[in-house]
Amino acid sequence: MEDEDGEDRALLGGRREADSAVHGAPRALSALCDPSRLAHRLVVLSLMCFLGFGSYFCYDNPAALQTQVKRDMQVNTTKFMLLYAWYSWPNVVLCFLGGFLIDRIFGIRWGTVIFSCFVCIGQVIFALGGIFNAFWLMELGRFVFGIGGESLAVAQNTYAVSWFKGKELNLVFGLQLSMARIGSTVNMNLMGWLYGKIEALLGSAGHMTLGVTLMIGCITCIFSLICALALAYLDRRAEKILHKEQGKTGEVIKLRDIKDFSLPLILVFVICVCYYVAVFPFIGLGKVFFMEKFRFSSQSASAINSIVYIISAPMSPLFGLLVDKTGKNIIWVLYAVAATLVSHMMLAFTFWNPWIAMCLLGFSYSLLACALWPMVAFIVPEHQLGTAYGFMQSIQNLGLAVIAILAGMILDSKGYLLLEVFFIACVSLSLLAVVCLYLVNRAQGGNLNYSAKQRERMKLSHPE
């Protein structure tokens, strides 16, 4: 208990400092009101977790309403997948600029509020596109939504680093990711049901029903905006009481660092892009796939399509702990990519219960994120981390934008079987890149595949 209290005081300033800062009076604040106390930081943590809830809830609105969007807006799958492509396009650039805008232009508090406003406005425009039967307006809404979505995640992480440090931080990141996946899961299972209720209320299906349903979904974005405003107030208050600095991302983006990227880092980029383009576009198109191939009802198809996110919510923190304790990142990535390949092959070539394949995909997706992304920190020096992660997210969004359009074209012209073969090819390329990374890393000393004990020994033998 004494150590924990000491950590709290070191984290955000001493309690004595907090007491003396309020109107100059040396009286103690209550635990809920004292920014240096755990109870207050738990309130802040809950606001941080809900900060991204609306964004993740609304991101997969098109997937949850795939049938309704295509029918009511009279568009084919290629145009439908543009709703995902338009989200990704701005983030090809904003992944480099988001941290800069937060650090140098807006500050963390205003940056979070502004990006939350972009998310809200984008969702409103998206819903208005349905109400006015204007698909171009829906595309515009997704573009505006995308401007805020990814940068809001950067702001969320910046708040986390500002308020929590050391051993707490991994748990906080895990809880934030879990809440994000809960938002995606609730969307997948709620929006179809909500559409049915609105349809019964208005007396018919159509673009108006779709637009009203999407507008109701905007409530989650407004809720997240309220959390952003509350966080800004509490962070400003803590800054005054504890005399602490406003949080910064710590990202230093230098495009000239790209020329120094090594072969292992390039292979990590290839693994990342080829893997995620076989997951997110598949989920975006998955509902109708399960309805057509496996004869699921609309509600059952939504449920199985959301299982990846349901599994990811509790398993991401657990897998993060597992990788931290064991090391061997490349081996875990190899297992994750191989399991994903098996999952897609089962869905493509068998009629086995798809719950098996989707659960396998959920576990492998969660494991890959925990093992792949930390590897970047083992490859590049600390001063290049911002550039490396920014570039990784940028090309990931570029890949998602291009593959979303391509997947829609394949589905329209060739059907789901060839689309699954295409996804299998993407995962196979990712698997090949993992094998190449293993061989290259082995030739260079094998640091990416060190066990946790080996890494600990390396730290002790090379103190900073």
Curated annotation (Swiss-Prot):
Keywords: Lysosome, Membrane, Phosphoprotein, Transmembrane, Transmembrane helix, Transport. SUPFAM superfamilies: MFS general substrate transporter. Gene3D superfamilies: MFS general substrate transporter like domains. One of its GO terms (cellular component) is lysosome. The modification Phosphoserine is found at S20. The chain crosses the membrane at residues 38-58, 82-102, 112-132, 134-154, 190-210, 214-234, 265-285, 303-323, 330-350, 360-380, 391-411, 417-437. The keyword Transmembrane helix applies. Induction: After 24 hours of starvation, up-regulated in the brainstem and down-regulated in the cortex and striatum. Following 8 weeks of high-fat diet, down-regulated in brainstem and hypothalamus. It catalyses: L-alpha-aminoacyl-L-arginine(out) = L-alpha-aminoacyl-L-arginine(in); L-arginyl-L-alpha-amino acid(out) = L-arginyl-L-alpha-amino acid(in); L-arginyl-glycine(out) = L-arginyl-glycine(in); L-alpha-aminoacyl-L-lysine(out) = L-alpha-aminoacyl-L-lysine(in). Not N-glycosylated. It is a multi-pass membrane protein. A motif (Dileucine internalization motif) lies at residues 11-12. GO terms for molecular function: dipeptide uniporter activity; protein homodimerization activity. Pfam families: MFS_1. InterPro entries: MFS, MFS_dom, MFS_trans_sf, MFSD1. In brain, expressed in the cortex, striatum hippocampus, hypothalamus, thalamus and brainstem (at protein level). Widely expressed with highest levels in kidney and spleen (at protein level). GO terms for biological process: dipeptide transmembrane transport from lysosomal lumen to cytosol; protein localization to lysosome; protein stabilization. Disruption phenotype: Splenomegaly and development of severe liver disease characterized by extravasation of erythrocytes, sinusoidal damage, loss of liver sinusoidal endothelial cells (LSECs) and fibrosis. Normal life span but there is a significantly higher occurrence of liver tumors in old animals of more than 1.5 years of age. Significantly reduced levels of Glmp. Conditional knockout in LSECs results in a tuberous liver appearance. The dileucine internalization motif is required for lysosomal localization. Lysosomal dipeptide uniporter that selectively exports lysine, arginine or histidine-containing dipeptides with a net positive charge from the lysosome lumen into the cytosol. Could play a role in a specific type of protein O-glycosylation indirectly regulating macrophages migration and tissue invasion. Also essential for liver homeostasis. Belongs to the major facilitator superfamily. Homodimer. Interacts with lysosomal protein GLMP (via lumenal domain); the interaction starts while both proteins are still in the endoplasmic reticulum and is required for stabilization of MFSD1 in lysosomes but has no direct effect on its targeting to lysosomes or transporter activity. This is Lysosomal dipeptide transporter MFSD1.
